């Protein structure tokens, strides 16, 4: 027994000594890599002597005369200088997403003198984009955003199979997209190809920014920067993801984040190799209406069990190429919680035929029968609304439905206090039509209102207006504001 304990103690001592030796070797490797990076940076330095750099007796310069004029005020910044400007000119930056983030990022990177900019975006320009996507103009509505932003690039859709072939030709990647599945794909590809990634997002009045996979160490090297999966191992619930179209966005907010992305890209391009311990990864949070508007949260290092950057990674270039990694399945698809039967839905055109005197037409009036409930939030209801419609936000309806579900199953459900008197009346059987912006929330609201007993056990019709106010504009009122 005593011999076994001595053996165990000896093994522990050997392990500790080996780990200490390994830590020392890692430190030596980091110093060597830093020195190699410095030598490489020195190798790119361009020195022109009095006798050199002359053609036919005329002195030549590393930049064109126009470039000195254009970038002069940038080059006198110590962190950039001539060598930084030369690095920018030789850099290749890929921007995925030519929207609210990608437009200002591309604008400022091009203005800074980045030699090659690549854009990937499959969307077309819409009028609703113009207040924040500063590369697009009214004349380009309907064109692909890539064609609008930079004429010589063709439209491209990013898929797992083609992402590596697109990314490999660039030095740094900017994620300017707005959906989780694409974000995970971009991050995975950047890690597997050893590319730094500048990722940003913006919604309403807030934004976030991260520099990921920086320094871009090999898969399994814990000294490398974390990836998107390290920060968010699990994607958000699909139904919780809110787009700018649904949640809204202030142009200057997304512009701020795009400009910051461009700034971080310039820093990565012009700076020497980063020391992970000296520059820990962080998440920058911007809130336009907070004081102060900026704050920083330190991020953890690479996760030991990360699916893409750990030693036991399950996501590889091979899995991307064969398409075995299903990013849409991984992130989930937001499904409609309560799809109604055809009998519970009515088109705007059919509603006008069924109630010709009640439905407003071209500035006409509407009586209180039938009742139209608009379930958009108040800020949207105030933008435009059907005359005499009642605003009951979907959030209010869902909150009441949740309380009803937690009540005694044997008790008679009580109607909520926010219901208008005519709807809460026990004698009222007037039909209720629910409308929202696109026809999705209205279906959920109909289900909840029936759970609350508004249909009087089937005696009162409760249904939704199919297609929402967008369909109303298409079928009834072409002058209806589209936002």
From Swiss-Prot:
Active site: 244 (glycyl thioester intermediate), 436 (cysteine persulfide intermediate)
GO cellular component, one term: cytosol
Cofactor mode of binding and number, as noted: Binds 1 zinc ion per subunit.
GO molecular function terms noted in the UniProt entry: AMPylase activity; ATP binding; identical protein binding; metal ion binding; molybdopterin-synthase adenylyltransferase activity; molybdopterin-synthase sulfurtransferase activity; thiosulfate-cyanide sulfurtransferase activity; URM1 activating enzyme activity
Binding site for ATP: 100, 121, 128-132, 145, 178-179
Primary site of residence: cytoplasm
Keywords: ATP-binding, Cytoplasm, Metal-binding, Molybdenum cofactor biosynthesis, Multifunctional enzyme, Nucleotide-binding, Nucleotidyltransferase, Transferase, tRNA processing, Ubl conjugation pathway, Zinc
Keyword presence, Zinc: yes
Domain Rhodanese: 366-481
Disulphide linkage map: none
Documented EC number(s): 2.7.7.80, 2.8.1.11
Known pathway: tRNA modification; 5-methoxycarbonylmethyl-2-thiouridine-tRNA biosynthesis
Subcellular location: Cytoplasm, Cytosol
GO biological process terms, semicolon-separated: cell budding; cellular response to oxidative stress; invasive growth in response to glucose limitation; Mo-molybdopterin cofactor biosynthetic process; protein urmylation; regulation of pseudohyphal growth; tRNA wobble position uridine thiolation
Catalytic activity: [molybdopterin-synthase sulfur-carrier protein]-C-terminal Gly-Gly + ATP + H(+) = [molybdopterin-synthase sulfur-carrier protein]-C-terminal Gly-Gly-AMP + diphosphate; [molybdopterin-synthase sulfur-carrier protein]-C-terminal Gly-Gly-AMP + S-sulfanyl-L-cysteinyl-[cysteine desulfurase] + AH2 = [molybdopterin-synthase sulfur-carrier protein]-C-terminal-Gly-aminoethanethioate + L-cysteinyl-[cysteine desulfurase] + A + AMP + 2 H(+)
Cofactor(s) the protein requires to work: Zn(2+)
InterPro entries, alphabetized: MOCS3/Uba4, Rhodanese-like_dom, Rhodanese-like_dom_sf, ThiF/MoeB/HesA, ThiF_NAD_FAD-bd, Ubiquitin-activating_enz
Chain sites annotated for binding Zn(2+): 227, 230, 306, 309
HAMAP family (alphabetical): MOCS3_Uba4 (MF_03049)
Similarity section: In the N-terminal section; belongs to the HesA/MoeB/ThiF family. UBA4 subfamily.
Task performed by this protein: Plays a central role in 2-thiolation of mcm(5)S(2)U at tRNA wobble positions of cytosolic tRNA(Lys), tRNA(Glu) and tRNA(Gln). Also essential during biosynthesis of the molybdenum cofactor. Acts by mediating the C-terminal thiocarboxylation of sulfur carriers urm1 and mocs2a. Its N-terminus first activates urm1 and mocs2a as acyl-adenylates (-COAMP), then the persulfide sulfur on the catalytic cysteine is transferred to urm1 and mocs2a to form thiocarboxylation (-COSH) of their C-terminus.
Official protein name in the record: Adenylyltransferase and sulfurtransferase uba4
The organism's taxonomic lineage, starting at the top: Eukaryota, Fungi, Dikarya, Ascomycota, Pezizomycotina
